[in-house]
Amino acid sequence: MTNGSFRQIINQLDMRWRRRVPVIHQTETAECGLACLAMICGHFGKNIDLISLRRKFNLSARGANLAGINGIAEQLGMVTRALSLELDELGALKMPCILHWDFSHFVVLVSVKRNRYVLHDPARGRRYLGREEMSRYFTGIALEVWPGSEFLAETQQIRISLRSLINSIYGIKRTLAKIFCLSVVIEAINLVMPVGTQLVMDHAIPAGDRGLLTLISAGLMFFILLRAAVSMLRAWSSLVMSTLINIQWQSGLFNHLLRLPLAFFERRKLGDIQSRFGSLDTLRATFTTCVVGAIMDSIMVVGVFVMMLLYGGYLTWIVLGFTMVYVLIRLVTYGYYRQISEETLVRGARASSYFMESLYGIATVKIQGMAGIRGTHWLNLKIDAINSGIKLTKMDLLFGGINTFVAACDQVAILWLGASLVIDNQMTIGMFVAFGSFRGQFSDRVASLTSFLLQLRIMSLHNERIADIALHEKEEKKPEIEIVADMSPVSLETTDLSYRYDSQSAQVFSGLNLSVAPGESVAITGASGAGKTTLMKVLCGLFEPDSGKVLVNGTDIRQLGINNYHRMIACVMQDDRLFSGSIRENICGFAEETDDEWMTECARASHIHDVIMKMPMGYETLIGELGEGLSGGQKQRIFIARALYRKPGILFMDEATSSLDTESERFVNAAIKKMNITRVIIAHRETTLRTVDRIISI
């Protein structure tokens, strides 16, 4: 037997008393199947995160069916068995196993005891259900999964190290060093203060020496003033550090987010992305408020422990014993605390996504009479998030109560034992009072340090959420080349172009060969759902093809660079958006320097200039992010004007005139045709199709 095979067998052995099934929440809207497999793999010792699974098995926003999950499980070295069964037969399954849930979801069945079912839901976390609710959602399909001969228990997790995050901040090391030095001064003063109290009680008071009392008091006052001044300086330095971290982390992550491929956003909910971005604030707050304090707590724990040994002898070990009770309680309950923390974040993000979705579709909500339903559903989601937060608060209150109780017991025990030592003349009153002060500092510092260390572990949760954005591969950016934006027509060609949404789905199109000459206008037609918009996004460089090439003027757009290619083209898509600002800013792309004459010409070509001029503020008219106050046709004409303002060599239009009346559509098509630029159009209207040189059906 080789060392490698022996190591594999050792990894597969589980010598623990109990195998846990981890709770893993899905990130994308349709990756519940991947999350279920990640949980089962974790149960059998293969700790693999969703980022790793996603990179290996690229699923689309449409998700995967049971056959797809079965195929992925086999590639992970698992053995599977699909079953159709009744609810009463669930207890006979090999658990954990995967259940088909509510005809559109997958969950992991962890255990069945009497009529109590424990599930790990990728969308909601750990759930305890009764028979009635199980009967309502279980579809009768289950998938048993267990390790096969090729299964390897290992760790495959992609994460961001805290060190790399810290090292990426300019000026952080100098600021940290300053804060550390100031903290040393403050903590040294804290150690001196009890000694001053002891000197007063053991020397100044028994001797009746007012001069010594005055000298000690003056010295203590000096140290108090010094501590206040240094504390203010440290607070200012902490503010500087917090600002440095906040700006650099958030700007870096936001810039990275904007450069991610379109598919990343299509598979996620906006509220979840916003929640993950907000995890930066938690990391920043934890780092700026706790890291330096934790370092000083560590130093002080050692220093105070030594002082306690010098002053109290064996009393120190009693204090240590009481303190360890609290530490052990926190360590034992950490797993549950982390699980609730993650559920709170996920449920809050889900409620936020639903809230934003309702606002974006407010017109539909009103027209369809869905206000009551949407309001009730949002309230239920919010209550779920609040309940998770309440659980977290309860645990914090419980820990606070336990800490107070343990500290009180410790204080009473030390009071009795210490007073006995004083009565027996084995300790002076001053030493006893000083020891009590050191005891309080030791207990508080250990409790604070324990909370920080556990908080540091909780930070890994936020780290994982940020990693989903930060470690996602962004679009490749090539060095910018000089491109003259003068509407010179360019050629467009595809060779053996193929695309499918993911490895589990059929190809949308394959072996596609197109050729569009410079200045030619081509219309792409086909039945709804045939893949016209998907093809348009591939041609625009928004989606990357599985195989084949897209060539512009004979150059592969990947070789040219998507960033350079986008400077040569303009697109008007079905789901285009206006941004909060003026009409001028939207047409000119919020550029600092604008060409008003060309802007007006583009607006005239789009048949929107006269409409804009009738508005009280003309081109300075403000519009909201949803384009309030504008009709669908007016928005589309502004979209077209915005595209023309870029002076593109190719203009892509996906149903760009579908909301226009016949006269406006005829005018816009004629005006664009006169510009003699290359056009690729998706359209169904005969009036638009008559303006093109060639029609391609797919």
Curated annotation (Swiss-Prot):
Disulfide bonds: none annotated. Its main location: membrane. The keyword Membrane applies. ATP binds at residues 526-533. Residues 26-145 form the Peptidase C39 domain. SUPFAM superfamilies: ABC transporter transmembrane region, P-loop containing nucleoside triphosphate hydrolases. GO terms for cellular component: plasma membrane. The chain crosses the membrane at residues 33-53, 90-110, 289-311, 315-337, 397-417. It is found in: Cell membrane. Pfam families: ABC_membrane, ABC_tran, Peptidase_C39. Residues 492-698 form the ABC transporter domain. One of its GO terms (molecular function) is ATP hydrolysis activity. Residues 176-458 form the ABC transmembrane type-1 domain. Gene3D superfamilies: ABC transporter type 1, transmembrane domain, Cysteine proteinases, P-loop containing nucleotide triphosphate hydrolases. Keywords: ATP-binding, Bacteriocin transport, Cell membrane, Hydrolase, Membrane, Nucleotide-binding, Protease, Protein transport, Thiol protease, Translocase, Transmembrane, Transmembrane helix, Transport. It is a multi-pass membrane protein. The keyword Transmembrane helix applies. It comes from the Bacteria. PROSITE patterns: ABC_TM1F (PS50929), ABC_TRANSPORTER_1 (PS00211), ABC_TRANSPORTER_2 (PS50893), PEPTIDASE_C39 (PS50990). Its EC number is 3.4.22.-, 7.-.-.-. The active site is at residue 32. GO terms for biological process: bacteriocin transport; protein transport; proteolysis. Belongs to the ABC transporter superfamily. Probably involved, in conjunction with MchE, in the secretion of microcin H47. This is Probable microcin-H47 secretion/processing ATP-binding protein MchF.
